[in-house]
Design a protein with these regions (language model features):
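Short, amphipathic alpha-helical interaction segments positioned at domain boundaries
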Residues: 63-88
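Leucine-rich, amphipathic alpha-helical/linker segments
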Residues: 81-110
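Generic structural signal for hydrophobic core residues of well-folded globular domains
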Residues: 15-16, 49, 69-72
Length: 117
């Protein structure tokens, strides 16, 4: 299954918005395609350090996950980030974060007059 960066962002947003401390993505024998995608992407989020598995199919967002989400939360920043990643032919989640932070720094300079270098 190919990694879907929009879906990664969606799972992080869902996890943060939930009143529950955990995101469920339980693996079972008769999983639908959507359930497989959810489980696989939750595992990818664990690989990246953005989620921690607290039980089989039960995940919590980590501080690293919150930081990534803070960088990609804005739809404007996210769309610019995806466009830039596409121009590069695809990038790692770390580069996605760096691109998003770069756009946030540009906005800070324009809107606040602060150069965050």
């Amino acid at each position: 299954m190919k990694r879907d960066d929009d879906y990664i962002r969606q799972l992080l947003l869902e996890s943060e918005a939930s009143s529950e401390p955990y995101l469920m993505a339980v693996q079972h024998l008769s999983m639908t395609t959507e359930e497989q995608k959810r489980h696989q992407h939750a595992e990818l989020l664990c690989d990246a350090g953005f989620f921690e598995a607290v039980n089989k199919g039960v995940y919590r967002i980590t501080n690293q996950g919150h930081d990534y989400l803070a960088a990609v939360r804005s739809d404007t920043v996210w769309n610019k980030t995806k466009e830039s990643a596409g121009q590069l032919g695809g990038v790692t989640l770390g580069i996605m974060r760096d691109l998003a932070v770069g756009y946030i720094k540009q906005e800070a300079k324009i809107k606040l007059g602060i150069d965050l270098g």
